[in-house]
Every structure is written in C-alpha cells, then in structure tokens.
Amino acid sequence: MQEFSLSTLLEMTVGLASGANNEERFHRLLDAVRKAVICDCVVLMSLHNDTLTPLAMQGLTRDTLGRRFVVSEHPRLAQICSADLPVRFAADCPLPDPFDGLLLDSEDDLPMHSCMGLPLHFGEQLLGILTLDSLKPDAFDHLSPRSLEILAAIAAATLKMTLTFSELENQAKQTQLRLEELNQEAWSRDSVEIIGNSGPMLAMKADIDVVAPSQFNILIHGETGVGKELVARTIHQRSNRKRQPLVYVNCAAIPENLLESELFGHVKGAFTGADRARMGKFALADGGTLFLDEIGELPLSAQSKILRALQNHEIQPVGQDRVQTVDVRILAATNRDLKKEVEAGRFRADLYHRLSVYPIYVPPLRERKGDLSLLAGYFVEQARRKLGITQLKLHGDVLSQLIQYPWPGNVRELEHVINRAALKAKARQRGRPVTTLKVEDLGELQGPRAAMVEPTAQDEPMLGEWIGELGLRDATDEFQRHLISETLTQADFNWAEAARRLQTDRANLTRLAKRLGITVSRSHSIERSR
C-alpha cells in the first residue's frame, strides 16, 4: 500500500487558503489531488439536503457544473455519503456511475472502470464528497486507507474554510443568502436556482443582493422568457418577508371588469354572481409580497386603483364601505419599455415612479451566451430525472449549435428545446446505459417567427405600406393582428394551439386579441373590428 510522502502532503496544503475566490481555492485543491492521485477526472461537490452540487471539477464536460445530483437517485453517491471512510468501488461494480459518458474531449460512451469517493466530514457534519474516476481498472488499489483519510481531511478542511468565509460575507450583507460556489445561488431542493456567472448575470445578482433586504418596490424588466418571475421569487426569498406569502398576479390574464374584485376582493352580494365574500390579492399578500406580472398590460383605469393602494397602503373591497390597511411590498414585471409607455400616455407616470424605486434588468440569453453550458447542464439533468434516464449527456456539437442560435424565446425556449431533444434521444437510443443528446435531436431551432406563414407576393406590398404610412405603435398592432389571424387560421381556430405556436399562454393571447379587435365567429372565420 502506497503512502503519501511528506513533500506531497505539504504541496497539497500550501496555498489552499490563499486563493482569491472560492473557485480558485477549489481548483487549487483539485490540482493538488491530481498530483497526489493519478486519475482521469475529479469532482468536488457540496451537500444540501439530499442534493449534491458540483463546486469544481476537472476532466469532465463543463455542463457537469450545471447538474444537480439527488443522492437517493444515484446508488454510488448514496453509498459514499453514508460512509464514514473513503469508498472504493470494484471494477465490476454493477451500480451505475453518475459520470459515465461525461469524460472531457470524448464523444464515446466510455465507462469509468475505477471509482473512488471520499466523504468530507467536519466534526459530525457531512459537508460534501470528493469523487475520483479513472478509465484504468484498479487505478486506486495501491493507495493506503490512511493516505485517503488524510486526503479527505484536507479536502474537508478546505471546503469548511470556504463555506465559513461565505457565511461571514452573508452575515456582513445581512441577507439570508445561502451562497454556493461559482457565484451560483441555490435554495433548498424544492426551491429554485438562478444559473449563471456571466457579467450581465453577476450585475443582476449584485442588484438583487442590494435591494432584496429593503422594503422598496421593484420593477423587473426584460424580454419574454428571461426569468422575471424567478427573479421576483429570489428577491422575496432574500427579504425579511420570506416567511410571509408571495402572491402572483398575471395582470394580462384578468378581464378588465374583474380587476378590482381580483385585486381588492369583494363582499357577498357586491355584484351579480358574488354569492360569497372573497379576499383580493392585496389582502392575501398582507405582510408579504405581491408580484404583479405583465404590469404594462393594465388598462389606465386599473392603474389608478393600484396607485391609490400604493400611496395610502389601503384597499377597499368591492361593495364594502370601510377601507382596510395592508402591508404589501410590490414587485412588478414587464417586457414593455414603461418609460416609452408613459410618454405615449398608455401608462401613468406617477404609478411608474412608485413601482420603479429600484429597477432590475434581466438580460436576454443572447447577452449571456457564456452561461449556455451551465444552463444546458441544468436543464439536461432536469430532463434526465423527469424522463427516468440513467445517464444523459450532450454530444460535443450540441453546445456549439446552441451558442450559434439567437434564442428569441430566451431561457424558457432553451428549456423547452432540451426537453424535446431529450425525449427524442431517449426514444432513439432506448436501452442504452448512456443516452446522448445529439444535434439531430434539436430539430430545427426556430423562434416566434416560426408560427408565421411565408408572405406571398400579394402580402409584401401591404407590409411595405405599414412601414411607410403608420407610426411604430400602429404598425406593431397591425403586424400583431396579421400574425395572430394567420396563426389562428393555421391552428383551426384553436386558441390554445395558436398560443402554443406563438410561444405565449392562452390568456395573454386572448387579451391581446381583444385589444386588437380580433374575434373568431361561430362559423370559424376571423373578424376584425379595427
């Protein structure tokens, strides 16, 4: 049995505490481990609840960092986590290796022949694990148990030190943030996670860190599909209201005649059909946070009522004489430029200033292409779990294909593309131990324009007339009328199918169609009132 020399141990410990950041400290640790133990790949993971999160890795595809490994779903990881001492798996062990097929610079489904895992304990607490894999059988048999215990102790001390630094930083900022390494934010297993380390995402996360603990109203703005609701949930989770409700309202989905009742509630008998009293969204969010999604779609009449609630912190349910006080923090989201809407007279300036005390911009995916590998890995692991696939990996050409695509539907579109591709890959490779998601599984990457019919020669002059004779708003409305009408016709006048093709939800589509004067007659024909 081989023991580590004193010089090897000193080399492993020197400099581990001097890294400029968590990522650098962890990679120094992995560099030292690979000098001491020859292996093809090594992964450091932290444990939270029943989920292992990769903090740093060497030798595996980069999308591995975006994956989350539920311990109960991976027998080898479960065995390592439940052990007190390092675990070595036999070359013929039947348990699946979670990293099979993920070896860097290899398109083959190469299995790992040697696998070893070190539980990282600090006192009685299991902080995480360190895994080492090799394509060479019996690669770790020569290492003595004592050497592996020392290696585990050094790794655990490094991980504990780094986690402690993060905890102290969190306390200094007076937030409830549980910071994971690589500047990614994670909640508990049943929560959500903001993935990304690109410059625009780090700037957005910094804004969240600054404003979340405050009581300020926040305007979250960005394109459709960028994750504005996720940002709102993150802000609520970081605030001192996190133990109180977060109430969601889609402003575009509520008919105008029901808005007041939906937001402020009503008493029994307030109007026809009000057979019982009902609390409104403001009352339900009392003490917590109210998220007003698609705030830019509210009609002016509803905007004035919300403004009064924000100014006075009072609401008056429909049919009730007295007012009641509420303590609500407002988070609003929109994909519109509200400054321009104010200038055009479609949005109240006083409400805009009340809402945008601290605006947060959520960047589109095309501005954060550096996050694509992490996002792809995250969605691939989610798809693997949903579809019950033992192992799902990305072919090397897939990431380059994803990076070249402009992603008009942003992160939401990426998630849907990977889910569809994973389903196709599973059907095509049924029965294989490692399922590979290939370029052909992506299909034809198309954005919202895919739902449009090709313009005919007869149509083209009309499009030119829009540009020449209409203002921007009117031209946009006319284009939307044309697009919705054509899509409805192609979808056999099925609103749900048309909404799917246009990558929106049915409520938003019907509301927009109503504003544009589009209706479908009983004889299944498009009627326009404008």
UniProtKB/Swiss-Prot annotation:
Keywords (alphabetical) are: ATP-binding, DNA-binding, Nucleotide-binding, Phosphoprotein, Repressor, Transcription, Transcription regulation, Two-component regulatory system
The Sigma-54 factor interaction domain sits at: 194-423
Under Pfam families, the record lists: GAF, Sigma54_activat
Write down the SUPFAM superfamilies for this protein, in alphabetical order. GAF domain-like (SSF55781), Homeodomain-like (SSF46689), P-loop containing nucleoside triphosphate hydrolases (SSF52540)
Task: List the InterPro entries hit by this protein, alphabetically.
Answer: AAA+_ATPase, GAF, GAF-like_dom_sf, Homeodomain-like_sf, P-loop_NTPase, Sigma_54_int, Sigma_54_int_dom_ATP-bd_1, Sigma_54_int_dom_ATP-bd_2
Q: Which PANTHER family match?
A: ANAEROBIC NITRIC OXIDE REDUCTASE TRANSCRIPTION REGULATOR NORR (PTHR32071:SF35), TRANSCRIPTIONAL REGULATORY PROTEIN (PTHR32071)
Record's protein name: Regulatory protein LuxO
**Organism expressing this protein natively:** Vibrio cholerae serotype O1 (strain ATCC 39541 / Classical Ogawa 395 / O395)
